[in-house]
Amino acid sequence: MGDEKDSWKVKTLDEILQEKKRRKEQEEKAEIKRLKNSDDRDSKRDSLEEGELRDHRMEITIRNSPYRREDSMEDRGEEDDSLAIKPPQQMSRKEKAHHRKDEKRKEKRRHRSHSAEGGKHARVKEKEREHERRKRHREEQDKARREWERQKRREMAREHSRRERDRLEQLERKRERERKLREQQKEQREQKERERRAEERRKEREARREVSAHHRTMREEYSDKGKVGHWSRSPLRPPRERFEMGDNRKPVKEEKVEERDLLSDLQDISDSERKTSSAESSSAESGSGSEEEEEEEEEEEEEEGSTSEESEEEEEEEEEEEEEETGSNSEEASEQSAEEVSDEEMSEDEDRENENHILVVPESRFDRDSGDSEEGEEEVGEGTPQSSAPTEGDYVPDSPALSPIELKQELPKYLPALQGCRSVEEFQCLNRIEEGTYGVVYRAKDKKTDEIVALKRLKMEKEKEGFPITSLREINTILKAQHPNIVTVREIVVGSNMDKIYIVMNYVEHDLKSLMETMKQPFLPGEVKTLMIQLLSGVKHLHDNWILHRDLKTSNLLLSHAGILKVGDFGLAREYGSPLKAYTPVVVTLWYRAPELLLGAKEYSTAVDMWSVGCIFGELLTQKPLFPGKSDIDQINKIFKDLGTPSEKIWPGYNDLPAVKKMTFSEYPYNNLRKRFGALLSDQGFDLMNKFLTYYPGRRINAEDGLKHEYFRETPLPIDPSMFPTWPAKSEQQRVKRGTSPRPPEGGLGYSQLGDDDLKETGFHLTTTNQGASAAGPGFSLKF
């Protein structure tokens, strides 16, 4: 039964009809055969028993006929037996029971097929319902997502509008701050301008008062001579003096009051200055002066300070007119008025002289010897309060006192800039390092902090002509260009006299030139890249601040034990601007000088420093100068031989250079620079070298683009500065004579080389036995 269930399948209507047709044909054949067999048996029957036996055998034969077996095999077992049509008289009871079982099985199968079809339909419907449910779920999710996106867009729009509103508010606040700052700056400028004008007017008034005091002194001397001798020469003076002392003086005072109202703002500005000057004048007076006289003098000075130039000129003109009109007054009135006016003028002149002898410039700490002499003069003044000239028994100074005008003229203009500077006595000299472009450098120790510093003494051979412009440029430039790769200035110190000025800088152990002279092996490619990156960073900072160094070379590049490179020696540095101005072409040491300078160009810019950087690049790789020329012509020929002779095509404006117009140069058609480096320089490195050494300054690479070059990003990469090897500091040893490197240009100033012998008798010198070469000594030996 199990096999039948497993092999059962539902037949189609066509299959059932075909099966019925086939079975009908088989039944017809079987009937024909049965009839034939029955005829044969009838003909062979002999007796009843045999017939019975034959009938029984025939029944067995019919029951077990081969047709039935074949039919059962073809129709797959019992299924075909149930479909076979048998004569009713031949079916036994067992077969009927079997037939009923088959009918039941078929009924079950039909029921099962119907239930299977119903289950299939149910599954299909369930799938459809599941599909619908999923579809609705997806639609709900899409709707929720779209709603979330709309909400997100609205939030983003609100956030954007809020940020935009905040940005606009910040911009508005920034503009408001800038506007207020501009207003404040404008007010400050106006205030400074008002103060400056008030100061100028005050100085002019003081100068006029000094001139008028001088004139009154001369008139007083003339009046004294007239009283002693010839009385006939004095009739012209009384009317003027009476005019000054009489009723006609009142309108002049009223005029001063009006002008004081007009110049009230200037009085407020300079009020503190007048108070300090009046206090100094009162302290400088003789001991017999009382407090009442000091108050009267202050009032007179305020009245005189409030008058303008126009009022004084009008007063003088009126006095001259009155002198001409009243030329015939009596001798008695002239004597009385002359005595009164002379007394007043004497007191006023003494006050002004006392005022002018007091210097407003405060005393500096490094010039104490001059302070002692001033104290001596003050003591002498106190001993003789009422006498303008010393007596025979009094102390007479070595040098006569100078007039106030002469003192102001001789006062150096750079003195206020050096107020508060420490003395060089506070440093202990250890040894001499090197002589720079415009000064000598020493290694010294700060006695207070025990720090090792570098002291550079500025050359002051021509101090009589004023402070050297090169020293001013160096100090100004080096203070303005502070950077990790530029030497750090700590302070300015002075010696006993104003002609000894020192720049105190952080001490750096090596300079590249002396270091490469002692190195057995050249720098590694990674070390060269690190040095070049630091050099380009320092040069970029200078150029960004509109500064030309104009003397870049290996001896001016310092290297510390920490691997930090610093650019030094700003003796030739200067600021430049746009448009370019004509500068001197005699700058930069010969070996590092750009071709445009060698050919006489006067307008140049940062490209001259970049050419020097390229020369330093080649020297770091080979430990030898790239173009070691012996003269300007030899330098040009060496450059042309390695880089090829330029032309107007590769260097626009080449034919217009002064040297090109005057002479012709050898023709070198090819660039042979690559052969000099070989494996020391990669293709990217040679490309950078060519960009540094480009003939046309307008196409020469700048420091910023040089830092971005691919040469610094290829292997081997630049090493960390802290990984640099250390060498013994040559500057801490006894100074060795420098090699054959040429000296930098001196700019036509004719400075001589400054040695230790030049330092003697000039404020300090090194206490060593050997002259010229300075070893470590006990310190400075100063003379005041």
From Swiss-Prot:
<dbReference type="GO" id="GO:0042981">
    <property type="term" value="P:regulation of apoptotic process"/>
</dbReference>
<keyword id="KW-0808">Transferase</keyword>
<feature type="compositionally biased region" description="Basic and acidic residues">
    <location>
        <begin position="114"/>
        <end position="131"/>
    </location>
</feature>
<feature type="modified residue" description="Phosphoserine">
    <location>
        <position position="72"/>
    </location>
</feature>
<comment type="similarity">
    <text>Belongs to the protein kinase superfamily. CMGC Ser/Thr protein kinase family. CDC2/CDKX subfamily.</text>
</comment>
<feature type="compositionally biased region" description="Low complexity">
    <location>
        <begin position="278"/>
        <end position="289"/>
    </location>
</feature>
<comment type="function">
    <text>Plays multiple roles in cell cycle progression, cytokinesis and apoptosis. Involved in pre-mRNA splicing in a kinase activity-dependent manner. May act as a negative regulator of normal cell cycle progression.</text>
</comment>
<feature type="modified residue" description="Phosphothreonine; by CDK7">
    <location>
        <position position="477"/>
    </location>
</feature>
<dbReference type="InterPro" id="IPR011009">
    <property type="entry name" value="Kinase-like_dom_sf"/>
</dbReference>
<feature type="active site" description="Proton acceptor">
    <location>
        <position position="551"/>
    </location>
</feature>
<feature type="binding site">
    <location>
        <begin position="433"/>
        <end position="441"/>
    </location>
    <ligand>
        <name>ATP</name>
    </ligand>
</feature>
<dbReference type="GO" id="GO:0004693">
    <property type="term" value="F:cyclin-dependent protein serine/threonine kinase activity"/>
</dbReference>
<feature type="modified residue" description="Phosphotyrosine">
    <location>
        <position position="583"/>
    </location>
</feature>
<dbReference type="GO" id="GO:0000307">
    <property type="term" value="C:cyclin-dependent protein kinase holoenzyme complex"/>
</dbReference>
<feature type="modified residue" description="Phosphothreonine">
    <location>
        <position position="584"/>
    </location>
</feature>
<keyword id="KW-0547">Nucleotide-binding</keyword>
<keyword id="KW-0131">Cell cycle</keyword>
<feature type="modified residue" description="Phosphoserine; by CDK7">
    <location>
        <position position="471"/>
    </location>
</feature>
<keyword id="KW-1017">Isopeptide bond</keyword>
<dbReference type="GO" id="GO:0001824">
    <property type="term" value="P:blastocyst development"/>
</dbReference>
<dbReference type="GO" id="GO:0046605">
    <property type="term" value="P:regulation of centrosome cycle"/>
</dbReference>
<dbReference type="InterPro" id="IPR050108">
    <property type="entry name" value="CDK"/>
</dbReference>
<feature type="modified residue" description="Phosphoserine">
    <location>
        <position position="47"/>
    </location>
</feature>
<dbReference type="GO" id="GO:0043484">
    <property type="term" value="P:regulation of RNA splicing"/>
</dbReference>
<feature type="compositionally biased region" description="Basic and acidic residues">
    <location>
        <begin position="18"/>
        <end position="60"/>
    </location>
</feature>
<dbReference type="GO" id="GO:0071962">
    <property type="term" value="P:mitotic sister chromatid cohesion, centromeric"/>
</dbReference>
<feature type="modified residue" description="Phosphoserine">
    <location>
        <position position="741"/>
    </location>
</feature>
<feature type="modified residue" description="Phosphothreonine">
    <location>
        <position position="740"/>
    </location>
</feature>
<keyword id="KW-0597">Phosphoprotein</keyword>
<keyword id="KW-0067">ATP-binding</keyword>
<dbReference type="GO" id="GO:2001234">
    <property type="term" value="P:negative regulation of apoptotic signaling pathway"/>
</dbReference>
<feature type="domain" description="Protein kinase">
    <location>
        <begin position="427"/>
        <end position="712"/>
    </location>
</feature>
<protein>
    <recommendedName>
        <fullName>Cyclin-dependent kinase 11B</fullName>
        <ecNumber>2.7.11.22</ecNumber>
    </recommendedName>
</protein>
<dbReference type="GO" id="GO:0106310">
    <property type="term" value="F:protein serine kinase activity"/>
</dbReference>
<feature type="compositionally biased region" description="Basic and acidic residues">
    <location>
        <begin position="138"/>
        <end position="227"/>
    </location>
</feature>
<dbReference type="InterPro" id="IPR045267">
    <property type="entry name" value="CDK11/PITSLRE_STKc"/>
</dbReference>
<dbReference type="GO" id="GO:0005634">
    <property type="term" value="C:nucleus"/>
</dbReference>
<feature type="region of interest" description="Disordered">
    <location>
        <begin position="722"/>
        <end position="784"/>
    </location>
</feature>
<feature type="modified residue" description="Phosphoserine">
    <location>
        <position position="115"/>
    </location>
</feature>
<feature type="modified residue" description="Phosphoserine">
    <location>
        <position position="578"/>
    </location>
</feature>
<dbReference type="GO" id="GO:0005654">
    <property type="term" value="C:nucleoplasm"/>
</dbReference>
<feature type="modified residue" description="Phosphoserine">
    <location>
        <position position="270"/>
    </location>
</feature>
